[in-house]
Amino acid sequence: MSNGPLSNRPLPSSFDSNDDFYNENGFQKVLRRLKEEPLVPIGCLLTVAAFTNAYRAMRRGDHAKVQKMFRARVAAQAFTVVAMVAGGMYYQADRHKQKELWKLRQQKDAEEKHQKWIRELEARDAEEKALQERLDKRRKRAAERAGGTGTESVAAQARAALRESKAGKTETGEATSTEANQADGGVLGSLGGWFGGSKKAPEDTTPALESKPEDPKN
């Protein structure tokens, strides 16, 4: 039965385990009715037989038999109607119960469909949540990888800048040492020239003036 509150649940019935009663088709239902009310089909057969005999007597021209068969047909029809009314009154309680059970069966089927629909929605919701979690994990891993790559690139740039700074300092130190050595060599050479020997006069680099030609008048 349904999983609702106890107050909404129908009372148990002896038909609950009778699946054949709920799942019978039209032909099975007619057979069940014939078994429950056998006088009704008997009255129908008597009516058909009386009508057939009346037709045959009419073809033969036997008017007395025709009248007799028509009376028999009316009696058979009346018997059928009485059987139907009596059967309806006798099985009224059972039919009412069957109708209620049919309604309960319909409610049960509707509740089962509703519960199945809810379970399907819950399953879809769980699948969507699992998919969303996987997507979030992938995004997180991608972000972590991107962050690690960025940190490594920054560290590599810092190391390269440090190496360039050290190389610049080394070159600057070497250039300073070379200039200092050159300056020391020049000073020592000058001191050696002054204290080690006579100072030479600077050579006159001015070119000698060419003598002018004598005046022919002198």
From Swiss-Prot:
GO biological process, alphabetically ordered: mitochondrial respirasome assembly
Segment forming the signal sequence: none
Cross-referenced Gene3D superfamilies: 6.10.140.1320
Keyword ATP-binding annotated: no
UniProt entry tagged with the keyword NADP: no
Listed Basic and acidic residues bias regions: 161-172
Positions of region (Disordered): 132-218
Compartments, record wording: Mitochondrion membrane
Compositional bias of kind Gly residues: 186-196
One of the Pfam families matching this protein, by short name: HIG_1_N
Residue stretches spanning the membrane: 38-57, 69-91
InterPro entries hit by this protein: Hypoxia_induced_domain (IPR007667), RCF1 (IPR050355)
Coiled coil: 103-137
Lipid bilayer topology: Multi-pass membrane protein
GO cellular component, one term: mitochondrial membrane
Keyword tags: Coiled coil, Membrane, Mitochondrion, Transmembrane, Transmembrane helix
Domain (HIG1): residue spans on this chain: 11-102
Oligomer status and interactors: Associates with the respiratory chain complex III/complex IV supercomplex.
PANTHER family the record matches: HIG1 DOMAIN FAMILY MEMBER 1A, HYPOXIA-INDUCBILE GENE 1 HIG1 -RELATED
Family from the record: Belongs to the RCF1 family.
Known function: Cytochrome c oxidase subunit which plays a role in assembly of respiratory supercomplexes.
Name of the protein described by the UniProt record: Respiratory supercomplex factor 1, mitochondrial
Organism: Podospora anserina (strain S / ATCC MYA-4624 / DSM 980 / FGSC 10383) (Pleurage anserina)
High-level lineage: Eukaryota, Fungi, Dikarya, Ascomycota, Pezizomycotina
